Amino acid sequence: PYFGMVQYGELMQFCYVWLRKLMGGEFPGLELETTRHADELTGNETAERDIEHFAEGLAAVYRRMAAALKPGAPLVFTYHHNKQEAYLAAAMGILDAGLTCSASLPCPAEMGGSIHINGTGSSIVDTVFVCRDTGRAPRHTLVENAAQLAALMTKELAQLTAAGMKPTAGDIRCIAFGHIARMAIWNLRPVWRTSRPTAEKLEAIRQAMDGIATIEDVRAALEEGQPVGTVGIQRKNNDNQEQANAVAF
């Protein structure tokens, strides 16, 4: 991100060199000369670690984490990226771990003025993925198309606006990707086969996501709907009603 000189996955090594120089190699935790490791899990074109490598690594990590969970306990992580490809890897990891998403929640996570994203159109909003092997999901969040997703996102964007944030096109894109990935996972879980080749699994997720909505579809649906800034923030149902309308998985 730093004018193409440092890959984002290599940023910690860039910082570590200077930190070690300042603190000294005898400082606890700084004994090693480098943070790099042959088994590190990053996408890195230079090191020939592609999306399949990243997806397989995430799946291995999520499987271990899922095995340690109590039944119905959540595995929660934050995620955002400008490209759909990155969400394919996360979705594959969740599905290979035998989990589904009971929620995907937009959450401000970064300052818009951060050096590596300033002026790039990148999002400052993460999606909080809440994943379980069994549980319940609110029925109104189980969207099937761009129009339904736009209705859900309109409320979320209004909430972000009311909190003092001004959602950008990049934020809208990443929020949409998070929801579309969640629903692709929901739809694929009953027929998911972990034994399939990675390339086939990633393509199945891509098709499932595109079958729900593309980013262009969502943008168009949002433009046709009510302006984000004028949507009131209120719950249609109380907690008891929402639980009654929840869908078990």
Describe the role of every protein-language-model region:
Residues 1-249:
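S-adenosyl-L-methionine-dependent nucleic acid methyltransferase catalytic domains
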